[in-house]
A protein has these predicted regions:
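Intrinsically disordered, low-complexity linker/assembly segments
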Residues: 73-77
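Short, flexible, glycine/charge-rich loop motifs used to bind or transfer phosphoryl groups or to couple energy/partner
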Residues: 27-28, 78-80, 102-105, 129-130
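Non-transmembrane alpha-helical segments in soluble domains
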Residues: 26-29, 95, 139
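Short beta-strand-to-loop acidic/aromatic patch adjacent to the donor-nucleotide binding site
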Residues: 86-99
Length: 141
């Protein structure tokens, strides 16, 4: 088992069906002891899933509404850090989670973000502050 006390495993899912997200969370937890594990979800899901707390998953509501894909993306970029108390976090999703924990490399902690770079496009990927974003597609950060 790998110990990563400075890494929070985190996921955001405000839908009615957490099964894919929980698969990603539990699969990621199977070979790694994270400093914290958090699921950002609705109050209804928190009320209906007390077993998750027993399994060591802290459940929190989002600090702003997430109603669609654009809200989700905005939330992850601008609000996810409000839920993280460790130096790093690993965001998992139903289609992106840890499969081979034995491949972990502590050198990854030297980077502030690991994700796929996007090509520069003059009129695209601009944040609300006018800055161009050139990375996306989730990753270890």
């Amino acid at each position: 088992m790998i110990n990563l006390p400075d890494v929070t495993l985190i996921s955001v899912d405000t839908t009615d069906d957490l099964s894919g997200t929980l698969n990603g969370v539990y699969t990621s937890m199977s070979g790694i002891n994270f400093g914290d594990v958090k699921l950002i979800t609705t109050q209804e899901q928190i009320d209906n899933n007390p077993k998750l707390v027993e399994d060591g998953i802290t459940m929190q509501t989002p600090v702003r509404d997430i109603k669609n894909y654009n809200d989700y993306n905005y939330y992850v970029v601008y609000h996810l850090h409000e839920h993280v108390d460790t130096s790093h976090c690993l965001l998992v999703q139903p289609d992106g989670f840890v499969l081979f924990p034995d491949k972990w490399d502590d050198a990854w902690l030297e980077y502030d973000y690991i994700g796929a770079p996007w090509a520069f496009v003059e009129d695209a990927y601009i944040d609300p502050f006018g800055r161009h974003w050139r990375v996306g597609n989730g990753g270890f950060s």
